[in-house]
Regions:
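Accessory RNA 3′-end/elbow-binding domains used by RNA modification enzymes
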Residues: 1-49, 121, 138, 161, ...
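RNA pseudouridine synthases
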Residues: 1-185
Length: 307
């Protein structure tokens, strides 16, 4: 019997392998928020994608249970933030906009003293910076950037470039990979939805919050495989050409998603595209035995050959 397709999974199945697009409140750490999600849903494991400092709010995707296997494919996704930059002295608006534009492209940053990681110089890319509004010495801007970019440090450097000094007043993450603010849920929403499911047997609110893990992996090139190849992949076998239904245009050594014809994620892999091997499995996402077994182990083959 095959897995239900992603959109038809039961609540229990979503709790086992789902993702929540959570609106992180100001105050707690990202780790604390993930721990609260575990307690609310009475599950054993939850992990977050991309760490937000305690005062920062916004998009914090939470992976549930088996979905945490996918975290390695998600931590380096591009991010977008909306930030309030406070200038320490008044600067003409055109100059502020010109200086901000100069920060697009590749930057070299050392994490700020308040960060939770080692303060080693890192290279990061700013994709775009757009000024949204200005009130006095407060500048509201939107920035799209590579994962691991420190917006606090960006604000400091902008102030230095302007010659007046500046700091980050407020920060909110508005995008993390395929997740944005269009379908955010709060911890309060999650608590209420779980209560409705347990007490009133109404699963609609919880189903509206927990998405299939495939939603988090929608950015990856998708290889579609035959049902006969699924269980072998679930046991860690390499994906060979005969097992492939559809192959996207990918480069070698690229991270890919390996899917069934029903759009269920089977595994994450690295494209090989050589010697009849299409991809090497990096992380199995589907439980073995979900699909019928069509392959034979080396031990069984040797036994049959010797019979």
């Amino acid at each position: 019997m095959t897995n239900p397709v992603a959109q038809q999974r039961t609540i229990d199945e979503l709790l086992q392998k789902g993702v929540i697009n959570l609106d992180k409140p100001a105050g707690p750490t990202s780790h604390e928020v993930a721990a609260w999600v575990k307690r609310i849903l009475h599950i054993k494991k939850a992990g977050h994608i991309g760490t937000l400092d305690p005062k920062v709010t916004g998009v914090l995707p939470i992976l549930l249970q088996d979905a945490t296997r996918a975290v390695g494919a998600l931590v380096n996704l591009p991010k977008e933030y909306v930030c309030v930059l406070h200038l320490h002295k008044t600067v003409p608006d055109p100059l502020v906009r010109d200086i901000l534009r100069e920060f697009t492209g590749v930057l070299y940053q050392r994490p700020p003293l308040k960060s939770a990681v080692r303060r080693q110089i890192r290279k990061r890319e700013i994709y775009y910076i757009d000024v949204l509004e200005r009130q006095g010495n407060d500048v509201l801007f939107k920035v799209g950037c590579e994962a691991g970019t420190y917006i606090r440090k960006l604000c400091h450097d902008v102030g230095e470039a302007l010659g007046v000094g500046a700091h980050m007043q407020e920060l909110r993450r508005t995008k993390a990979g395929p997740f944005d603010e269009s379908k955010l849920s709060t911890l309060h929403d999650l608590t209420d939805a779980y209560h409705f499911w347990i007490e009133d047997h109404d699963e609609a609110p919880l189903r509206d919050i927990i998405m299939p893990v495939e939603r988090a992996l929608s950015h990856l090139p998708k290889i579609i495989i035959r049902d006969t190849a699924v269980d072998a992949i679930c046991h860690g076998a390499q994906l060979a050409e005969p097992g492939v239904i559809s192959l996207p245009d990918v480069d070698r050594k690229q991270l890919v998603g390996i899917y069934t014809a029903r759009d269920e994620i089977v595994a994450l892999g690295i494209s090989v595209l050589q010697g009849g091997v299409i991809a090497k499995v990096k992380r199995v996402m589907m439980e073995p035995g979900t699909y019928p077994r069509y392959w034979k182990s080396r031990k069984i083959r040797k036994h049959e050959e010797g019979a």
